């Protein structure tokens, strides 16, 4: 979750995926060591996760990409729900292409869930349905 204060739609969509797939819902927040932590944002994220029966992990890392990749690998993650990449250079594209066995979903601004089927072109402008 990139912006903790706009995460509710992502977590709710994740709850739907977890319910359908009969898997656990885990909210992962990876923050850069370069920026100070925002306790209000973390508390808000925790509250939304709790309301949706999700476990929450907050991690601090110098290399966010590497940390997320390692987390997905170590936890044998089957489904990942994120927001829509804002640019074609987004770290999300790199993560999507790293894992053939993981099903990725994005959630648009309206809260609609979309499966990522073409990992090379999916950008914000593509998801206006």
Go through each PLM region and give its residues.
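Small/aliphatic-rich secondary-structure junction motif
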Residues: 1-52, 57
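Structural motif
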Residues: 1-4, 30-31, 61, 82-86, ...
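Residue-level detector of structured alpha->beta connecting loops
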Residues: 22, 53, 76, 100-103
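Short, hinge-like loop/turn segments at secondary-structure boundaries
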Residues: 42-47, 73-76, 98, 122-125
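Structural beta-alpha unit
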Residues: 52-79, 86-88
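Gly/Ser-rich helix-loop-strand patches that form or flank binding pockets
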Residues: 83-129
């Amino acid at each position: 979750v990139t912006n903790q204060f706009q995460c509710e739609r992502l977590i709710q969509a994740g709850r739907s995926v977890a319910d359908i797939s009969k898997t656990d819902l885990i909210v992962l927040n990876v923050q850069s060591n370069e920026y100070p932590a925002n306790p209000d944002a973390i508390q808000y994220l925790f509250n939304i996760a709790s309301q949706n029966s999700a476990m929450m992990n907050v991690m601090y890392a110098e290399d966010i990409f590497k940390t997320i990749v390692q987390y997905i690998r170590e936890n044998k993650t089957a489904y990942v729900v994120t927001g829509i990449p804002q640019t074609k250079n987004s770290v999300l594209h790199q993560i999507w292409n790293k894992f053939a066995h993981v099903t990725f979903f994005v959630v648009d601004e309206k809260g609609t869930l979309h499966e990522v089927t073409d990992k090379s072109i999916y950008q914000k402008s593509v998801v206006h349905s």
